[in-house]
Structures are given as C-alpha cells and as structure tokens.
C-alpha cells in the first residue's frame, strides 16, 4: 500500500522534492540508512532506482519509524511522509484513537497519504482474501 501511494510502482520516478524510486526515498535519508546498514558497499544515489535496493532501504526506514513510534503502524506511515517528530506529536495528541490520530495530522498531504494507504490496504486485503 505504501509503495503504491509513493510511486504507483514506478521504480524510475523522482518527485519534485527529489525523492527517488519505488518507496520515494530522499537522498539524504537513503544515504544515512544505507550507511547504517552497510548496504550496499558502493552505494550511489542512482541505486535508489533499483527495486531491490530501494525496497530494502525503504523497509529499513519504515521499520525505524515503527520502532520509534512504539509499533503504531498508522503513526509510522504518517512519520514516513511527514516526519517522525511530527508523527510523535500527532500520536500524543490522539491518545491511541486512530480516527482522532488522522484528524490530528496537521499537514493535508500527510493526512491524505495515511487515508489512501489504509484504503489501498483494504482493497488489497479483499483482492488477496487476507483476514
């Protein structure tokens, strides 16, 4: 759902802000995550257009968001788009209520992002007959 929202599965896309690839990683974020992982050894920003590299780095960055935000997937998605510090504030304001959390997101882009990811998730759940 996140990848669909970020790039519509286009591995060659670059956003107007400079985010690259399937999971739309910003170069500075990707470089920092790659350095922390030691992956790949001769990482360049052009590697962000390689699905295997982009997904691995994006998944690691998302895992950091999930960990930082106490396992709260909705907050992690908001943090992926709007920054982890902002997501932590919205999480605190909403006191665990997912509907209130969405309303606490102060950036319209991030609010719509979270809503669309969950809509996509429900569609995929039905398509693939997942519980």
Predicted regions and their residues:
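Catalytic glycan-binding domains that act on GlcNAc-containing polysaccharides
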Residues: 1-131
């Amino acid at each position: 759902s996140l990848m669909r929202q970020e790039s519509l599965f286009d591995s060659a896309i670059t956003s107007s802000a400079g985010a690259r690839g399937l999971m739309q990683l910003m170069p500075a974020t990707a470089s920092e995550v790659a350095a922390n992982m030691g992956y790949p050894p001769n990482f360049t920003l052009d590697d962000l257009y390689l699905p295997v590299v982009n997904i691995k780095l994006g998944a690691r960055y998302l895992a950091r968001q999930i960990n930082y935000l106490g396992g709260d997937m909705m907050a992690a998605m908001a943090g992926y788009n709007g920054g982890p510090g902002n997501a932590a504030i919205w999480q605190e304001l909403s006191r665990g209520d997912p509907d209130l959390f969405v309303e606490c997101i102060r950036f319209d882009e991030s609010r719509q992002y979270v809503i669309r990811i969950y809509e996509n998730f429900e569609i995929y759940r039905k398509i693939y007959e997942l519980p």
